[in-house]
């Protein structure tokens, strides 16, 4: 457990919250913008370094506030440029953040919880159970740490991080308020100024919160599907028993429609040998998604000890992909990145106890992040 200082952590405050904070200490609201730029654009955590802030205000801030991100436990860099950070949060648990570069694009995969309560059968985090929600500061702190690590400050100039995906450890919609606040900071010009099309939230299917999402934010949405029928999905993703497929897809369509633009849902589908990789599964998937504008990301499973699952053959994956292509869907197969630093999916057993095993996580979310700039709407199933 990391000891709390009792001070207000400014790192996770949205612009509105920051303005209220300055009101509360008797200062002008414009100070909020000044301080936010120092924190997020320049990566500053020392009030004395904020040179356009008066000395009196700096002293006041030091007495009642702080800028504190998660503690970096380790940082590793792969031969392919993938980076992985293990960070410790206030609860004492460790979570992971992974950066995947590709050309001019750099995607950061961010965690939202330590542990997970959803108990997906191919996910070791689910077997470990839920530990804690990350605070807004701990969620946005992963972006802050990565940005500082690259030395890409100010954040709006020659940025290394062009896309963020909430696909790390945990179910983002079960930490709704903190994740929403952090995503607002990702997109705010006083934060990281990332386009709404380049911020993606991935969910296993918490239907009420999908319906709530459009009232609070406009970001891209990805659905962890993993099965084309309720019977199989009930086994793989138990939350499906509460929110079955048609209910779930209806909520996703409502959300996408609410955006008022030609946006498509990303479908994530972890491929498990002899479980969900057969021709009949592809046929079911084609029928299931016929009314859902979407692109599909097939994710070959990376086995881990005692998982009970195996990766399908390349032929089985290609056959599945071809069937979906022939039906008119835009389909990609995830490419594994960062294996030499154990940043590839399923490679971190024993290093961090509370880590995700959702097999779609961490790497090769590059396909997702490319949607806005490389996937024309005409190439998607409508």
UniProtKB/Swiss-Prot annotation:
| Active-site residues, as the UniProt record annotates them | 96 (proton acceptor), 345 (s-methylcysteine intermediate)
What cofactor does its activity depend on? [4Fe-4S] cluster
Which BP terms in the Gene Ontology apply to this protein?
rRNA base methylation; tRNA methylation
User: Where S-adenosyl-L-methionine is bound, by residue?
Assistant: 170-171, 202, 224-226, 302
| Reaction(s) catalysed by this chain's protein | adenosine(2503) in 23S rRNA + 2 reduced [2Fe-2S]-[ferredoxin] + 2 S-adenosyl-L-methionine = 2-methyladenosine(2503) in 23S rRNA + 5'-deoxyadenosine + L-methionine + 2 oxidized [2Fe-2S]-[ferredoxin] + S-adenosyl-L-homocysteine; adenosine(37) in tRNA + 2 reduced [2Fe-2S]-[ferredoxin] + 2 S-adenosyl-L-methionine = 2-methyladenosine(37) in tRNA + 5'-deoxyadenosine + L-methionine + 2 oxidized [2Fe-2S]-[ferredoxin] + S-adenosyl-L-homocysteine
Q: How is the cofactor bound?
A: Binds 1 [4Fe-4S] cluster. The cluster is coordinated with 3 cysteines and an exchangeable S-adenosyl-L-methionine.
Keyword Methyltransferase recorded: yes
Q: Where in the cell is it found?
A: Cytoplasm
Keywords of the record: 4Fe-4S, Cytoplasm, Disulfide bond, Iron, Iron-sulfur, Metal-binding, Methyltransferase, rRNA processing, S-adenosyl-L-methionine, Transferase, tRNA processing
GO CC list: cytoplasm
Pfam assignment, any one: RlmN_N
Domain Radical SAM core, by residue range, is: 102-342
**SUPFAM superfamilies of this UniProt entry?**
Radical SAM enzymes
Provide the GO MF annotations for this entry: 4 iron, 4 sulfur cluster binding; metal ion binding; rRNA (adenine(2503)-C2-)-methyltransferase activity; rRNA binding; tRNA (adenine(37)-C2)-methyltransferase activity; tRNA binding
Q: List the disulfide bonds.
A: 109-345
- What does the record's miscellaneous section state? Reaction proceeds by a ping-pong mechanism involving intermediate methylation of a conserved cysteine residue.
- What job does the chain carry out? Specifically methylates position 2 of adenine 2503 in 23S rRNA and position 2 of adenine 37 in tRNAs. m2A2503 modification seems to play a crucial role in the proofreading step occurring at the peptidyl transferase center and thus would serve to optimize ribosomal fidelity.
The record's comment on protein family reads: Belongs to the radical SAM superfamily. RlmN family.
The protein's name = Dual-specificity RNA methyltransferase RlmN
This protein's species is Pseudomonas savastanoi pv. phaseolicola (strain 1448A / Race 6)
Q: What would be the name of the gene that encodes this protein? A: rlmN
């Amino acid at each position: 457990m990391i000891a709390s200082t009792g001070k207000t952590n400014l790192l996770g405050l949205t612009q509105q919250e920051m303005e209220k904070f300055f009101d509360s200490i008797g200062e002008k609201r414009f100070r909020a913008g000044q301080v936010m730029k120092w924190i997020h654009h320049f990566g500053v955590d020392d009030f004395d370094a904020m040179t356009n802030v008066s000395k009196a205000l700096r002293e006041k801030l030091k007495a009642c506030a702080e800028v504190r991100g998660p503690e970096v436990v380790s940082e590793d860099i792969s031969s392919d440029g993938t980076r992985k950070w293990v960070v410790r949060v206030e609860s004492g648990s460790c979570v992971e953040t992974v950066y995947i570069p590709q050309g001019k694009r750099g995607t950061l995969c961010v965690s939202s919880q330590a542990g997970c309560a959803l108990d997906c059968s191919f996910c070791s985090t689910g077997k470990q159970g839920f530990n804690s929600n990350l605070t807004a500061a701990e969620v946005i702190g992963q972006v802050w740490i990565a940005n500082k690590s690259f030395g890409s400050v100010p954040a709006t100039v020659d940025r290394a991080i062009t896309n963020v995906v909430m696909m790390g450890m945990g179910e983002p919609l079960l930490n709704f308020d903190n994740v929403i606040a952090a995503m607002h900071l990702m997109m705010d010009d006083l934060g990281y100024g990332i386009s709404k099309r380049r911020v993606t939230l991935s969910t296993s299917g918490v239907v009420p919160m999908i319906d709530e999402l459009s009232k609070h934010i406009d970001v891209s949405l990805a659905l962890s599907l993993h099965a084309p029928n309720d019977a199989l999905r009930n086994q793989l993703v138990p939350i499906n028993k509460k929110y079955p497929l048609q209910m779930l897809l209806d909520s996703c369509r409502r959300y996408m429609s609410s955006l008022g633009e030609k946006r498509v849902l990303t479908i994530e589908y972890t491929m498990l040998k002899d479980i969900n990789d057969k021709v009949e599964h592809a046929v079911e998937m084609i029928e299931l998604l016929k009314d859902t504008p979407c692109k599909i990301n097939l994710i070959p499973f990376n086995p881990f000890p005692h998982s009970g699952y195996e990766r399908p053959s390349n032929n089985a994956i290609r056959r599945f992909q071809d069937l979906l292509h022939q039906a008119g869907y835009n389909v990609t197969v995830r490419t594994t990145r960062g294996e030499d630093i154990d940043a590839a999916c399923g490679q971190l057993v024993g290093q961090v106890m509370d880590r995700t095993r959702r097999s779609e996580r961490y790497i090769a979310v590059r396909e997702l992040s490319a949607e806005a700039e490389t996937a024309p709407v005409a190439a998607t199933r409508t």
